[in-house]
From Swiss-Prot:
The protein's name: DNA repair protein RecO
Keyword 4Fe-4S listed: no
Organism expressing this protein natively: Ligilactobacillus salivarius (strain UCC118)
HAMAP family: RecO
Function: Involved in DNA repair and RecF pathway recombination.
InterPro entries: ARFGAP/RecO, DNA_rep/recomb_RecO_N, NA-bd_OB-fold, RecO, RecO_C
GO BP, one annotated term: double-strand break repair
NCBIfam families documented for this protein: reco (TIGR00613)
Similarity comment: Belongs to the RecO family.
GO cellular component term, pick one: bacterial nucleoid
Keyword terms: DNA damage, DNA recombination, DNA repair
Length: 260
């Protein structure tokens, strides 16, 4: 099915050359999920949509959406670009990671929650672009996206007794947190410190629209990263390309800190 002359909001995620003068541009749209657009004549003099199809550009687009094949853009109505993300390799990597994770969760499906997730991702990228800690914003998305992968940990209360005020640890076997008196039930629980647990629980409910500031020390950031990597590896079972780059950059940074 083709939806002609529709207006939609979108974020440009990537593009690649196609033939001599054309491009294939992938966008995350608010209504149609991730779609690939065929853009003709990109290299022709006077091409008017050049700025609109740069990576990490977002705005309102008009075009035809094909439910199965390539879609098409005919015009735009106001666009903006995440310049800091484009200019910083680390910010770029985390923004790409967020988009790749969301794409893995949604693919080309039209989901009733797609618009909500589009707005959430747009806000996440805006925060990263404005100077918020890119890893922490990505961690928040990781935690909140787990449900879309069929993994819905209970972060609110102990999965055994419902306790909400205690020391907690995360259990992959039980699919959520265990209070201290039930730690004995899972010898393979993650043995997380309470500061890491606090942030994981907080991340599961935080609304990015009301996030004014967030500061997490380096040690806790490292533990959050390792914990979420383990959950995604063991329970979700996906590994997106951008994470590999982030892991390498983190390793280089840690080695430099050791030398200092």
């Amino acid at each position: 099915m083709i939806y002609k002359n529709v207006e939609f909001s979108a974020i440009v995620t990537k593009r690649k050359n196609y033939r001599e003068r054309d491009m294939l541009v992938t966008m995350f749209t608010d209504k149609y999920g991730f779609k690939t657009f065929f853009v003709r004549g990109v290299r022709k003099r006077g091409f008017k949509l050049g700025a609109a199809i740069l990576p990490f550009t977002h705005g309102t687009y008009i075009g035809s959406i094909n439910s199965e094949g390539l879609s098409f853009i005919t015009a735009t109505k106001g666009i903006d670009q995440f310049q800091s993300i484009n200019q910083d390799i680390i910010l770029n990597a985390y923004a790409t990671y967020i988009l790749e994770l969301v794409k893995a969760a949604f693919e080309d499906s039209i989901d009733v929650t797609n618009t909500l997730w589009f707005e959430k991702v747009l806000k996440a990228l805006s925060l990263i672009n404005d100077g918020f800690d890119a890893q922490i914003i990505a961690n928040i998305i990781e935690v909140q996206l787990l449900g879309k992968f069929g993994v819905q940990p209970n972060w609110r209360s102990c999965v055994i007794c419902g306790e909400t005020q205690s020391q907690f640890d995360y259990s992959e076997s039980y699919g959520g947190i265990l209070c201290r008196k039930h730690w004995y039930m899972d010898k393979n629980r993650l043995n997380l410190d309470q500061r890491t647990m606090y942030y994981l629980r907080k991340f599961s409910i935080v609304d990015l629209n009301y996030l004014n500031s967030i500061k997490v020390n380096a040690d806790t950031k490292k533990k959050l990263k390792l914990t979420l990597n383990e959950i995604y590896d063991n329970q979700v079972g996906i590994y997106v390309k951008a994470r590999s780059f982030i892991d390498k950059m983190t390793k280089v940074e840690n080695n430099l800190l050791k030398k200092d």
